[in-house]
């Protein structure tokens, strides 16, 4: 992580917490190692648990600018909020998947859905994408629960996502 010194009004220098891309990589306190992959997109991995299964999933962080900087406190705060409320939010995610697909409480979600990735957007909105093992031929197998933060809401498959 690089730290730059910024000038104060009195000409004194103080450390800046701005992080900047270095060889397309940055270390973030929440996400760990992130790699700048293309215009406005950083990619990393995070270890988490959903449906009672621990896994390492992709984190896709979308930023608005292509200037190489990664300074996204809203996104970091959204993940901190999710992690602090995980026990409250995860059942809502499961409930929304059940509702969206018409599945009863006895259905084991991990039999059908594979937790694929977390998508985090500027401003802190983020959602999870899943791979649906039973997707009909010709349809996308990726399904999303979009906007985990600020609220949990089912959005359907990516063919409907615009």
Give the predicted meaning of each segment.
Residues 2-94:
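N-terminal "domain-start" segment
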């Amino acid at each position: 992580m690089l730290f730059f010194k910024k000038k104060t009004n009195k000409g004194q220098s103080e450390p800046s917490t701005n992080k900047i891309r270095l060889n397309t990589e940055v270390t973030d306190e929440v996400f760990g190692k992130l790699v700048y992959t293309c215009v406005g997109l950083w990619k990393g991995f995070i270890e988490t648990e959903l449906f009672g299964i621990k896994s390492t999933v992709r984190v896709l962080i979308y930023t608005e600018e292509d200037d190489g900087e990664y300074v996204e406190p809203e996104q970091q705060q959204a993940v901190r909020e999710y992690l602090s409320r995980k026990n409250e939010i995860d059942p809502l995610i499961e409930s929304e998947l059940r509702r969206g697909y018409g599945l009863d409480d006895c259905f084991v979600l991990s039999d059908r859905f594979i937790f694929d990735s977390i998508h985090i957007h500027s401003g802190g909105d983020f959602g999870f994408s899943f791979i649906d093992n039973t997707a009909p031929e010709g349809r996308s197998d990726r399904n999303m629960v979009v906007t985990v933060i600020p609220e949990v809401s089912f959005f359907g498959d990516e063919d409907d996502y615009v």
